[in-house]
Amino acid sequence: MVFLGKILPLALAALSVNGAEILSAPGAENIPNGYIVVMKEGTSTQDFDAHREWVASVHHERLARRGSTNVGGMRHTYNFNQGFMGYAGTFDEETIQEIANRDDVAYIERDQIMKASAIQTQRNVPSWGLARVSSRQPGGRDYSYDSTAGQGVTAYIIDTGIDIRHTDFGGRAVWGTNTVDRRNEDCNGHGTHVAGTTGGTSFGVAKRARLVAVKVLDCNGSGSNSAVIAGMQWAMQHASQNDPRRAVANMSLGGGYSQASNQAAAAIVRAGIFLAVAAGNDNRDARSFSPASEPTVCTAAASHVRDGKASFSNWGQLVDVYAPGQDIISARPGGGSRSLSGTSMASPHVCGLGAYLIGLGRGSGGGLCDTIKRMALPVISNPGSGTTNRLINNGVSQ
């Protein structure tokens, strides 16, 4: 947490107000009049309900005064039961200033666009990533694994959705929720590719895991940070209703540094769910991006077929492991496959490995990232300044 304290002044700019700070990530694509409001720790449910009623009344009073038909207002409510409570919506400057002046508000963050972390497509390339997970040397062509293969584990794919009818999922993929639009389908393809790497029968690391689509990004592969956090909350609550110790989640997406996003990610980990996150594709220090900069998640950088850092991959002390992320073949909506590159492709290898190890009884939750790091091979060349050189491995040596 000391390290995170050093990051914050570098990563966030704050508007000086008479009350809670209004934070904004430098270079972020902010959503006009969009805000995420986070309550102070210890706020009771009753006080939170009263606060939201007050916000609704203030907002509607402003609309009536202006004679406006632009509804806006509160859109998402967050209560992770793990030290993160708040809400998000669209408010005018006067309203957000009143909210900031409340004693029960910890901070306010400008809502921003979050994007999928895949960057390029190349057809007809060799599929090497899956084989690399079970090989001690590069160039392997086979993937060796225990037949449990993540059976009994649920993987939440927080992304663009999943083509749950794709034959590679064998009926193990189901729709969970949609916080971004009204199209309950993967109209982008990114999420289906990620799900295939996590748990596809042909392309996946954990071939018997159950896959749940949590759609937070639209057909263009983008969405608001507030919608992403709403999807994170849904996944945590759904897993907690079952057995969070047998749940993993993947977030192959990101944006500028967001204290709210990191706080939500940390709440998921505290709930006992293993969370794998893409480091990002800007060839920069991952500390400037979220949720990759949250220290308690398992942040994955991308490697290429020769066991080096992929040119686009983010790096830094907050990267936990490397995983295959360049020219990765996996499922595409409507059937068949395609190749994508990005830390988006690295993270689901880590998520799938987490599900695989839970199925073997090798751990769960946040501690699972430490297990994965211990099992990883110190083989990555030129990993980046201050960055681990460890590449994931499932322990089945070839």
UniProtKB/Swiss-Prot annotation:
Domain Peptidase S8: 127-398
Sites carrying sugar chains: 220, 250
Propeptide residue span(s): 20-117
Residue span(s) of domain Inhibitor I9: 35-115
S-S pairs: none
Single annotated GO MF: serine-type endopeptidase activity
EC code(s) of this entry: 3.4.21.-
InterPro entries the UniProt entry points to: PCSK9_ProteinaseK-like, Peptidase_S8/S53_dom, Peptidase_S8/S53_dom_sf, Peptidase_S8_Asp-AS, Peptidase_S8_Ser-AS, Peptidase_S8_subtilisin-like, Peptidase_S8_subtilisin-rel, S8pro/Inhibitor_I9
Compartment list: Secreted
Main enzyme class: hydrolase
GO terms (BP aspect): proteolysis
Key words of the record: Glycoprotein, Hydrolase, Protease, Secreted, Serine protease, Signal, Virulence, Zymogen
One GO CC term, this protein: extracellular region
Active site per UniProt: 159, 190, 344
Family named by the database record: Belongs to the peptidase S8 family.
Name of this chain's protein: Subtilisin-like protease CPC735_050320
Organism from which the protein derives: Coccidioides posadasii (strain C735)
Organism classification: Eukaryota, Fungi, Dikarya, Ascomycota, Pezizomycotina
